[in-house]
């Protein structure tokens, strides 16, 4: 797996107000506990810094309601890839119709929830800069949605340990929202069903309902129509994710999309082929690649170089969602030029594999954290 050279520790974003209460207790700097993990390969090292507020969150949850059967919760929030993505038309509401095979993968964030003494506001903190911690964040939107639908008056303190980069086409924010809905339901004693959570979630994001599948699904409409599927691939099939520092604006990608230049392959044919034959380059069609490559020409060059340098090591190389992550399925390792070329010194790298979940359980965190990058700056700055 790709690992990184020893970086300096960059500043973590943190909202101190998130840890103030009306009681005599207050936030202590001792709660900032950088966790360092090192691994070495090809003379490179990885340093991962994670803000860990466990002690504070645990105390708050216990103090709020000692009788509550569950007062705090730690959940894995995995991202997804689009194995294929067809854009089939434009709707009257301005959205596009799509048909896509979504699959959850083992790269993800960790979110910690605790009951809050507040009766009016959720408090969110995170370990990276550039991620909003107010009502713009999908986690807060999801919690507000849950209270609106159920009448619950419970609020939460949340810490988001972010590993999935933003602007990557991986659905990290959508996964966070789905995870928050699941957590709110658990911390309220399971007031509603999974199906209800899934139905509600489409009100705040088209990709969110997918995460209430079992991990693999054929999604249509805006993405909110979810047909659960059995896993079409071995779950241990490895892949590598390579995301350049530049992000693709989803709005700009769709603005440059020309429906007369999209693939003419029936998405149901793609689904049948991938189910029967597994992953191949011909199956991993993404109609958003041409407009994304127009927005970010270096992304097209990156994909071409990975295919050329892989020498058959990857079963397929393709872009996920609206970009800017390029996926290579079949190997967890990036091509050597990613290490050698100065142009790619700040890319985000992660190995991953497919994953699913059991009914009435959330996604389980993998035994090891696989995300890594080739610099501290790209590791810590997700803007």
From Swiss-Prot:
Binding site for ATP: 165-175
First and last residues of the transit peptide: 1-72
Main location: plastid
Record's keyword terms, sorted: ATP-binding, Chloroplast, Isoprene biosynthesis, Kinase, Nucleotide-binding, Plastid, Transferase, Transit peptide
Expression induction or repression: Circadian-regulated with a peak in the late period of the light phase.
Metabolic or biological pathway, per its Swiss-Prot or TrEMBL entry: Isoprenoid biosynthesis; isopentenyl diphosphate biosynthesis via DXP pathway; isopentenyl diphosphate from 1-deoxy-D-xylulose 5-phosphate: step 3/6
SUPFAM superfamilies from the UniProt entry: GHMP Kinase, C-terminal domain, Ribosomal protein S5 domain 2-like
Protein EC: 2.7.1.148
Biological-process GO terms, alphabetical: isopentenyl diphosphate biosynthetic process, methylerythritol 4-phosphate pathway; terpenoid biosynthetic process
InterPro entries: GHMP_kinase_C_dom (IPR013750), GHMP_kinase_C_sf (IPR036554), GHMP_kinase_N_dom (IPR006204), IspE (IPR004424), Ribosomal_Su5_D2-typ_SF (IPR020568), Ribsml_uS5_D2-typ_fold_subgr (IPR014721)
Entry keyword annotation includes Membrane: no
Gene3D superfamilies linked: 3.30.230.10, GHMP kinase, C-terminal domain (3.30.70.890)
Functional description taken from the UniProt entry: Enzyme of the plastid non-mevalonate pathway for isoprenoid biosynthesis that catalyzes the phosphorylation of the position 2 hydroxy group of 4-diphosphocytidyl-2C-methyl-D-erythritol. Is essential for chloroplast development.
Name recorded for this polypeptide: 4-diphosphocytidyl-2-C-methyl-D-erythritol kinase, chloroplastic
Species of origin: Arabidopsis thaliana (Mouse-ear cress)
